From Swiss-Prot:
Assigned protein family: Belongs to the staphylococcal tandem lipoprotein family.
Gene giving rise to this polypeptide: lpl3
Compartmental location: Cell membrane
Protein name, per record: Uncharacterized lipoprotein SA0398
GO cellular component term, pick one: plasma membrane
Species for this entry: Staphylococcus aureus (strain N315)
Membrane topology category: Lipid-anchor
InterPro entries associated with the record: Csa (IPR007595), Csa_sf (IPR038641)
């Protein structure tokens, strides 16, 4: 074989090798970019944390699409719930949901106390109690009289995670467990945190968390990654998760149409 032919063959082989390698890198880049897309999608609301004064949301507009009727300024939906299930005991949830209507500049919701028992010999039993609340001058107060002084105090002292959480370091979270289903669409990114993480310390400060295990942070959402008023975005700090014991905290801040609020 002549020199020119051997050289041409060498060039062809090298081009093929680079092409194969390039495809691998392209796939890695796409996976990495998907993680970045998820973080950027969540950052649209998480960058607002901490929201010291929730009434500031009356003047804050979120993502709008065709689901909003003309003239509707939208409603912010906030929730924070702590769920605990010690070994051998029932699952208990305590938290709050608040709906801030930007049209009426009023905020109402409810404090929830929920107990769920799952006996293999019986049907799952769910006992839920809701206490209606409203927000006045950035303070949560019960709408109806409450005889239980402990619950009343818990409501009046309640703070949403969005009021003290801070995600300025979100962009620095790396190597998350990424899941994405474009057909649903459903997406998530999970990160192992450390106990010295700011948000973890804030949760331990406010809640009696029995385990010393550092939690995993899960960012999970539905709908178009680029934005959708139909989809949902939730964050979850999971300290313990197994069949015998569960300890996790969930938080959400959504902007939606005011049709149902």
């Amino acid at each position: 074989m002549g020199y020119s032919k051997r050289f041409a063959l060498y060039i062809s082989v090298m081009i093929l090798i680079f092409a194969i390698a390039g495809c691998g890198k392209s796939d890695e880049t796409k996976e990495g970019s998907k993680e970045e897309q998820i973080k950027k999608s969540f950052a649209k609301t998480l960058d607002m944390y901490p929201i010291k004064n929730l009434e500031d949301l009356y003047d804050k507009e979120g993502y709008r699409d065709g689901e909003f009727k003309k003239g509707d300024k939208g409603t912010w939906v906030i929730s924070s719930v702590m769920v605990k299930q010690p070994k051998g005991e029932i699952m208990k949830s305590r938290g709050m949901y608040l709906f801030l209507n930007r049209n009426t500049r009023t905020a109402k919701g409810y404090f929830i106390v929920d107990e769920t028992s799952n006996d293999t010999l019986k049907k799952t039993e769910d006992k839920e109690k809701r206490y209606p609340v409203k927000m006045v001058n950035n303070k949560i107060v019960p709408i109806d009289p409450i005889n239980d002084k402990g619950v009343k105090k818990e409501i009046e002292n309640f703070k949403f995670f969005s009021q003290y959480g801070d995600f300025k370091e979100l962009k620095n979270y790396k190597n998350g467990e990424v899941s994405y289903n474009s057909e649903a669409p459903i997406y998530s990114a999970k990160y192992q945190l450390k106990n010295n993480d700011y948000n973890v310390k804030q949760l331990r400060k406010r809640y009696d968390i029995s385990t010393e295990k550092a939690p995993k942070l899960l960012l999970k959402g539905t709908g178009d990654l680029k934005g959708s008023s139909i989809g949902h975005k939730d964050i979850e700090f999971t300290f313990v998760e197994n069949q015998e014991e569960n300890i996790f905290f969930t938080d959400s801040l959504e902007f939606t149409s005011s049709e149902n609020y």
